Each structure stands twice: as C-alpha cells, then as structure tokens.
Regions:
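Acidic, mature catalytic/reactive cores of soluble proteins
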Residues: 1-223
Length: 223
C-alpha cells in the first residue's frame, strides 16, 4: 500500500495472503495463522485472546480491508471484489443460518470475526470500530476511484469488467459535480478523456475543482 516494497516481493506476499489467510469456506480473511497458543513466543497482548479470536487468528477487519486495497493496487480486480463481498456485512445476513452464525448487526462493520470452531463466522465488536472508515475509503477511493487531491479529483477506479458505467454525485463546498464514468471493457481502469459541461478538459483523469456555486456535469471515459 505504501509503494515502498519491491513489486515482485509484494506480489509474492499477497499470493501468500490469498493462499494462507483467505478462508473461502468461512468467508473471512484471517490476520494470521496459526494462532499463538502452543509456542513460547510472546507477541504481546494478542496471545491473551483464545485461538481464533480477534488478533489471535481471527479476522481483524482493519487488516482485511488493507489486504483488499493491496489486491486492488496490484490490479487484481477479481480477487479485490471477491474479498470486498466477504467484507460487506450485508452478506452476513443474506440467509437465516448465516445470520444465526454471525449474531451481530448485518448493516454495520464488525471490528473482528471469529475464525475458530465452534464460533467460526461470529461477529465481534460493532459500531465502535475504525474499520468503518477504512471500508468507506476502500469503497469510494479505491474501488470507485474517486480520489481527492489538491485542487482536483482524480478518477482511478478498480471496477468489475462487466460494468458499463456508474455515477458519482460529489459536493465540493457549495458546488455540485455530477460525474458519470463510462467503462471501456476488460482492462478499463485508466481515464482517456474528461469532459465537463460539454468541453473536453484533458486525458489524465483529473477533474479541476472550483467553488463557483454551480452544478457541473462531468463525463470520464476509461480504457
């Protein structure tokens, strides 16, 4: 995520995450595996949790969101959206048996999800978690690609290949920007043209921001 690592090692690390920590059977993303319970190692307070709970081998949702962000930055759309579906709490309440297992509200983010029997898939803390803010950033900034920079918006999405278009209504102080992003198919993630109010502005994906108290209609073409 910091872009500070070697690209090849980053891909190897994320491949290991996918292989070792993504639990498709339980629809969760573990923080680590195996848990600290049978060794002399002392990693700190996390060893105080029973195996599979919170940071000791459960899903710690902050890290799960960061992992999903990392897959998006690597351009792995399929993996990104698969993990996003795991993170989305609404999917925990899609069936009565899933809700019975989850036991907490399916409309807010849970700080953690248990990763060991007999409580695998049970939600932990809700409401009181910064994971909600990170989920918002993943959804808006990384997936939809709406990134606020100094003086402008940058559009750099990671959306499924079968999306034809999507819209974002963005309010900048007293000015409204109605943005339609048109996708160009299989590898569409780079803006090729930005048009505002019928005038072509650039081919960089940048939308200049000006608080003129007007409504602007923006079209962004991706390839």
């Amino acid at each position: 995520i910091s872009n500070g690592g070697d690209p090849m090692r980053a891909r190897k690390a994320m491949a290991a995450v996918d292989k070792r920590l993504v639990r498709r059977d339980a629809q969760l993303i573990q923080l680590l595996d195996p848990p600290f319970d049978k060794s002399d190692l002392e990693p700190g307070y996390i060893k105080g949790y029973v195996p599979g709970v919170r940071e000791n081998g459960g899903q710690y949702t902050h890290a799960a969101i960061w992992a999903t962000t990392a897959f998006a930055m690597l351009g792995d759309k399929e993996r990104t959206w698969e993990l996003f579906a795991m993170l989305n709490p609404i999917n925990r309440g899609s069936r009565p048996e899933a809700m019975e297992r989850y036991k907490v509200e399916p409309y807010v983010m849970s700080a953690d999800i248990y990763g060991a029997t007999p409580h695998t898939g049970r939600g932990g803390w809700t409401w009181y978690t910064g994971a909600a803010g990170w989920m918002y950033r993943l959804s808006v900034e990384t997936l939809l690609g709406l990134q606020l920079e100094e003086g402008h918006l940058r559009i750099a999405p990671c959306v499924p290949d079968d999306w034809e278009s999507y819209k974002i209504h963005y309010r900048y102080r007293d000015t409204s920007y109605h943005i339609e992003i048109k996708c160009g198919g299989e590898k569409s993630n780079h803006a090729t043209r930005v048009t505002m109010d019928g005038t072509v502005l650039n081919e960089t994906g940048l939308i200049p921001l000006q608080d003129d108290r007007q409504e602007h209609h923006v079209e962004v073409m991706l390839r």
